Amino acid sequence: MKIKNIILLGLVLFVVSAVNAQDIISVAELSKISKNSDVIVVYAGAEDDFKVHITGAVSVPHTSLCNDTPVRGLIKPTAEMAKILGSAGISSDKTIVVYDEGSGKYAGRMYWILKYLGAENVKMLDGNLTAWKSGRKPVTGAPTKVVAATFTAKPQAGYLAKMDEVKTAIGNSAYVLVDARTPEEFAGKAETELRKGHIPGAVNINYETVLDPKGMLKTNAELKTLFESKGVTSDKTVIAFCETSVRAGIVFLALKGLGYSKVKVYDGAYLEWQATSSNKVE
């Protein structure tokens, strides 16, 4: 039976990769493999929203992997994150499927964190919990029995950008900075305690525009058109960010799915940038 499940898992993941290059898994596909011992489903939203969840899923709020200081939202040291993930029963050699309440931004953040930590087989549930419920798949309010595991972290430095690299990117044709905030935030028209505006030279691609009206990731053709219309081409090093880089994660996922090889997330994000008085904003 175990061998049969492994074969089924392999076939499903092959179909996913063949149909769509993104690390996306559909409701139908996840429902076939969710009980496989080599698969773990992870809810990345707030703990309070885990009251109704996919049967068998574990809860790891993305905020549990981040610090509040010195900059809110920065990821914790690698060893701390690995310990938290392991205590939730997540091992880096499993197929990890992340999801959230439906917005995609928390799942996207968790996706990026896991990829940065070196987990190779990470998928995001297309449409998240909203799609799972619409598909009449099983949910529960009962807690999931967690068996602690070992998460072996192998940080991928190429997925993380720091402020010095962002400074290098400004005015550099080999780079493009992608701000995943709303147009209002980008233009400095949103109510905020932060310095209003954006990092000089950045282009604005609101994270919501990579999703269709149902919260599903757009097709590769649609995404390619969207990114290239903003000058985000695969020959450049792309650095994505938002206010705290939560929303940047799904942009990272979409770009990697298109085959962009040089994609990073500026984890300090606009929050860190604008807090440094010597940094200019537009």
Regions from the PLM with identified roles:
Residues 1-8:
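Bacterial N-terminal signal peptides that target proteins for export
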Residues 2, 17-20:
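Intrinsic disorder/low-complexity signature
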Residues 8-17:
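Bacterial N-terminal signal peptides
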Residues 19-282:
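Cytosolic catalytic domains that perform sulfur/thiol-centered chemistry
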